[in-house]
Swiss-Prot record:
Calcium listed as a keyword: no
Cellular compartment(s): Cytoplasm
GO terms of biological process kind: translational termination
InterPro entries documented for this protein: Ribosome_recyc_fac, Ribosome_recyc_fac_dom, RRF_sf
Pfam families membership: RRF (PF01765)
Function summary: Responsible for the release of ribosomes from messenger RNA at the termination of protein biosynthesis. May increase the efficiency of translation by recycling ribosomes from one round of translation to another.
Protein known as: Ribosome-recycling factor
KW Cytoplasm (keyword) present: yes
MF annotations from Gene Ontology: ribosomal large subunit binding
Record keywords: Cytoplasm, Protein biosynthesis
UniProt GO cellular component terms: cytoplasm
Protein family per UniProt: Belongs to the RRF family.
Length: 187
Protein backbone atom coordinates (compact mmCIF):
# COMPACT_ATOMS: atom_id res chain seq x y z
CA UNK A 1 0.00 0.00 0.00
CA UNK A 2 1.04 3.59 -0.46
CA UNK A 3 2.32 5.90 2.25
CA UNK A 4 -0.86 7.97 2.10
CA UNK A 5 -3.02 4.88 2.67
CA UNK A 6 -0.77 3.76 5.56
CA UNK A 7 -1.08 7.22 7.10
CA UNK A 8 -4.88 7.16 6.75
CA UNK A 9 -5.06 3.72 8.38
CA UNK A 10 -2.73 4.75 11.24
CA UNK A 11 -4.62 7.96 11.97
CA UNK A 12 -7.93 6.06 11.75
CA UNK A 13 -6.76 3.52 14.32
CA UNK A 14 -5.41 6.32 16.52
CA UNK A 15 -8.76 8.15 16.42
CA UNK A 16 -10.66 4.96 17.18
CA UNK A 17 -8.34 4.30 20.15
CA UNK A 18 -9.15 7.83 21.30
CA UNK A 19 -12.87 7.04 21.21
CA UNK A 20 -12.30 3.92 23.32
CA UNK A 21 -10.17 5.88 25.83
CA UNK A 22 -12.88 8.54 26.08
CA UNK A 23 -15.55 5.88 26.66
CA UNK A 24 -13.47 4.27 29.42
CA UNK A 25 -13.09 7.68 31.07
CA UNK A 26 -16.84 8.29 30.84
CA UNK A 27 -17.52 4.85 32.32
CA UNK A 28 -15.35 5.76 35.32
CA UNK A 29 -17.75 8.61 36.06
CA UNK A 30 -20.69 6.20 36.20
CA UNK A 31 -20.59 4.96 39.76
CA UNK A 32 -21.45 1.38 40.54
CA UNK A 33 -22.03 1.29 44.28
CA UNK A 34 -18.68 1.54 46.05
CA UNK A 35 -17.40 5.00 47.03
CA UNK A 36 -14.40 6.25 45.06
CA UNK A 37 -12.71 9.63 44.47
CA UNK A 38 -13.34 9.17 40.73
CA UNK A 39 -17.06 9.76 41.42
CA UNK A 40 -16.23 13.42 41.96
CA UNK A 41 -13.98 13.67 38.89
CA UNK A 42 -16.45 15.80 36.95
CA UNK A 43 -17.06 18.30 39.75
CA UNK A 44 -15.60 21.78 39.30
CA UNK A 45 -15.50 24.44 42.01
CA UNK A 46 -15.57 28.20 41.48
CA UNK A 47 -12.13 29.07 42.87
CA UNK A 48 -11.43 32.79 42.66
CA UNK A 49 -13.43 33.10 39.45
CA UNK A 50 -12.19 30.04 37.59
CA UNK A 51 -13.63 26.53 37.39
CA UNK A 52 -11.16 24.28 39.21
CA UNK A 53 -11.33 20.48 39.61
CA UNK A 54 -12.40 19.44 43.11
CA UNK A 55 -9.18 17.45 43.58
CA UNK A 56 -7.15 20.68 43.28
CA UNK A 57 -8.95 22.50 46.10
CA UNK A 58 -9.38 19.64 48.57
CA UNK A 59 -8.02 16.31 49.74
CA UNK A 60 -10.46 13.56 48.77
CA UNK A 61 -10.42 10.37 50.84
CA UNK A 62 -12.58 7.28 51.14
CA UNK A 63 -12.62 6.04 54.76
CA UNK A 64 -15.08 3.22 53.96
CA UNK A 65 -17.13 1.78 51.08
CA UNK A 66 -20.05 4.19 51.63
CA UNK A 67 -18.31 7.46 52.59
CA UNK A 68 -16.23 10.11 50.82
CA UNK A 69 -14.64 12.92 52.82
CA UNK A 70 -13.32 16.19 51.42
CA UNK A 71 -10.79 18.24 53.39
CA UNK A 72 -10.53 21.67 51.69
CA UNK A 73 -7.06 23.20 51.54
CA UNK A 74 -8.72 26.50 52.51
CA UNK A 75 -11.56 26.56 55.06
CA UNK A 76 -13.38 29.34 53.18
CA UNK A 77 -13.94 26.89 50.29
CA UNK A 78 -16.37 24.66 52.25
CA UNK A 79 -19.55 26.35 50.97
CA UNK A 80 -18.24 26.58 47.39
CA UNK A 81 -17.35 22.87 47.37
CA UNK A 82 -20.71 21.90 48.85
CA UNK A 83 -22.52 24.03 46.25
CA UNK A 84 -20.45 22.57 43.38
CA UNK A 85 -21.33 19.00 44.43
CA UNK A 86 -25.04 19.86 44.53
CA UNK A 87 -24.89 21.66 41.16
CA UNK A 88 -23.06 18.69 39.57
CA UNK A 89 -26.27 16.68 40.11
CA UNK A 90 -24.49 13.38 40.72
CA UNK A 91 -26.96 12.14 43.32
CA UNK A 92 -24.98 13.09 46.44
CA UNK A 93 -26.08 15.16 49.41
CA UNK A 94 -22.93 16.66 50.99
CA UNK A 95 -22.83 17.38 54.73
CA UNK A 96 -20.65 20.25 55.92
CA UNK A 97 -19.51 19.89 59.55
CA UNK A 98 -17.39 23.05 59.55
CA UNK A 99 -14.06 21.28 58.94
CA UNK A 100 -14.72 18.68 56.28
CA UNK A 101 -17.46 17.75 53.85
CA UNK A 102 -18.80 14.25 54.28
CA UNK A 103 -20.66 12.51 51.48
CA UNK A 104 -22.64 9.37 52.24
CA UNK A 105 -22.84 7.28 49.11
CA UNK A 106 -26.33 5.75 49.15
CA UNK A 107 -26.72 2.14 48.06
CA UNK A 108 -28.06 1.95 44.53
CA UNK A 109 -31.75 1.21 44.10
CA UNK A 110 -32.92 -1.02 41.26
CA UNK A 111 -34.33 2.04 39.46
CA UNK A 112 -31.05 3.95 39.83
CA UNK A 113 -29.12 0.92 38.53
CA UNK A 114 -31.34 0.86 35.44
CA UNK A 115 -30.78 4.60 34.94
CA UNK A 116 -27.01 4.12 35.21
CA UNK A 117 -27.15 1.20 32.75
CA UNK A 118 -29.12 3.42 30.37
CA UNK A 119 -26.50 6.15 30.78
CA UNK A 120 -23.74 3.62 30.04
CA UNK A 121 -25.59 2.50 26.88
CA UNK A 122 -25.90 6.11 25.79
CA UNK A 123 -22.16 6.70 26.29
CA UNK A 124 -21.38 3.51 24.36
CA UNK A 125 -23.67 4.58 21.51
CA UNK A 126 -21.91 7.97 21.38
CA UNK A 127 -18.58 6.14 21.14
CA UNK A 128 -19.91 3.96 18.31
CA UNK A 129 -21.07 7.08 16.46
CA UNK A 130 -17.56 8.51 16.92
CA UNK A 131 -16.03 5.31 15.48
CA UNK A 132 -18.38 5.42 12.49
CA UNK A 133 -17.56 9.07 11.85
CA UNK A 134 -13.85 8.20 11.85
CA UNK A 135 -14.62 5.42 9.35
CA UNK A 136 -16.55 7.84 7.14
CA UNK A 137 -13.68 10.36 7.18
CA UNK A 138 -11.14 7.64 6.36
CA UNK A 139 -13.23 6.32 3.47
CA UNK A 140 -13.65 9.88 2.14
CA UNK A 141 -9.86 10.33 2.23
CA UNK A 142 -9.35 6.98 0.47
CA UNK A 143 -11.87 7.91 -2.27
CA UNK A 144 -10.01 11.20 -2.73
CA UNK A 145 -6.75 9.26 -3.25
CA UNK A 146 -8.49 7.00 -5.75
CA UNK A 147 -9.59 10.05 -7.76
CA UNK A 148 -5.99 11.30 -7.64
CA UNK A 149 -4.79 8.11 -9.31
CA UNK A 150 -4.19 5.50 -6.61
CA UNK A 151 -5.07 2.00 -7.81
CA UNK A 152 -8.67 0.91 -7.29
CA UNK A 153 -7.54 -2.44 -5.80
CA UNK A 154 -5.36 -0.70 -3.22
CA UNK A 155 -8.22 1.63 -2.29
CA UNK A 156 -10.70 -1.25 -1.99
CA UNK A 157 -8.37 -3.20 0.30
CA UNK A 158 -7.79 -0.03 2.36
CA UNK A 159 -11.56 0.43 2.71
CA UNK A 160 -11.85 -3.21 3.81
CA UNK A 161 -9.10 -2.62 6.38
CA UNK A 162 -10.96 0.46 7.69
CA UNK A 163 -14.14 -1.63 7.95
CA UNK A 164 -12.22 -4.35 9.84
CA UNK A 165 -10.89 -1.72 12.26
CA UNK A 166 -14.42 -0.37 12.68
CA UNK A 167 -15.79 -3.85 13.43
CA UNK A 168 -12.99 -4.51 15.94
CA UNK A 169 -13.54 -1.26 17.82
CA UNK A 170 -17.34 -1.56 17.81
CA UNK A 171 -16.91 -5.06 19.29
CA UNK A 172 -14.55 -3.62 21.92
CA UNK A 173 -17.19 -1.00 22.82
CA UNK A 174 -19.83 -3.73 23.16
CA UNK A 175 -17.50 -5.69 25.47
CA UNK A 176 -16.81 -2.61 27.62
CA UNK A 177 -20.55 -1.90 27.81
CA UNK A 178 -21.38 -5.48 28.82
CA UNK A 179 -18.74 -5.35 31.58
CA UNK A 180 -20.00 -1.98 32.84
CA UNK A 181 -23.63 -3.12 32.82
CA UNK A 182 -22.67 -6.26 34.78
CA UNK A 183 -20.79 -4.07 37.29
CA UNK A 184 -23.78 -1.72 37.64
CA UNK A 185 -26.40 -4.44 38.02
CA UNK A 186 -24.36 -6.49 40.52
CA UNK A 187 -26.02 -6.04 43.92
Amino acid sequence: MTEEIDFILESTEESMNGSIAHLEKEFLNIRAGKASPAMLGGVFVDYYGSATPLSQVSKISVPDARTITLQPFEKNMLQAIEKAILIANIGFNPMNNGDVIIISVPPLTEERRRDLAKQAKSEAEDAKIGIRNVRKDANTDIKKLEKEGTSEDICKSAEEEVQNLTNTYIKKIDELLAAKEAEIMKV
